[in-house]
Amino acid sequence: MSDILNKIEAYKREEIAAAKRERPLAALQAAARAAPPPRGFVSALRAKLADGDYALIAEIKKASPSKGLIRPDFDPPALAKAYQQGGAACLSVLTDTPSFQGHLDYLVAARAAVSLPALRKDFMYDTYQVVEARAHGADCILIIMAALDDSEARDIEDAALDLGMDVLLEVHNHAELDRALALRSPMIGVNNRNLRTFEVTLATSEALAPLIPSDRLMVGESGIFTPDDLARLARVGMSTFLVGESLMRQQDVAAATRTLLARAA
């Protein structure tokens, strides 16, 4: 595991312990049961693909550890609406505060502004966080295979599926892909960013895509900025993408989203 993930795990486990003291699991489970039903995340992506379109998971991200502040005028509902107008299939909302200046309130506000399904983008280490995600309206969660062992990943996946949510299984090498394929979720995200060096290359997706069975939904993550990048990954069968930073930096987010998703004539 990389040094960055070690640091993140340390503060996340402190956060989780504090959250459990503040809001016991039973209370959180009641809130999750009372939450609006999940919107189908995988089904929304597959519907776009069935229409012959790219399927975009558009990310709402204020900052990152590597780039610092990305968008000073940060308005999650307005950004969600812009993404929906631009043709996104789903949202991804950062909820980690120390590294990304995210918050669960941003997830609630963004999802309420649109009809799109939303992913809680965070570092998941405990099933408590899964219930917390559903209680705040999340339709999908992220499992980073590099951060968890097989037993932890399976427990978190089971908790999400039991609550009717979808799961994005994130991998960035062959070994992590093999582990992810042993789980139940059909959605496999290939992170083009090396979590140890922070180097980004689309070659990661190009190398792993042929190893992913056709019944799985492949998602390209990180390093995707232009229509040419989308076309490059589509050539290896990857037509679903998670894009954040490049769109978050644009003044007109809806127009930038439309431009990114426009296939060459």
Curated annotation (Swiss-Prot):
A Pfam family the protein falls into: IGPS
PROSITE patterns xref list: IGPS
E.C. number: 4.1.1.48
GO-annotated biological processes: L-tryptophan biosynthetic process
Keywords for this protein: Amino-acid biosynthesis, Aromatic amino acid biosynthesis, Decarboxylase, Lyase, Tryptophan biosynthesis
Keyword Nucleus attributed: no
UniProt superkingdom: Bacteria
Catalytic reaction list: 1-(2-carboxyphenylamino)-1-deoxy-D-ribulose 5-phosphate + H(+) = (1S,2R)-1-C-(indol-3-yl)glycerol 3-phosphate + CO2 + H2O
A GO term, aspect molecular function: indole-3-glycerol-phosphate synthase activity
Pathway: Amino-acid biosynthesis; L-tryptophan biosynthesis; L-tryptophan from chorismate: step 4/5
SUPFAM superfamilies for this protein: Ribulose-phoshate binding barrel
Sequence similarity: Belongs to the TrpC family.
Full protein name: Indole-3-glycerol phosphate synthase
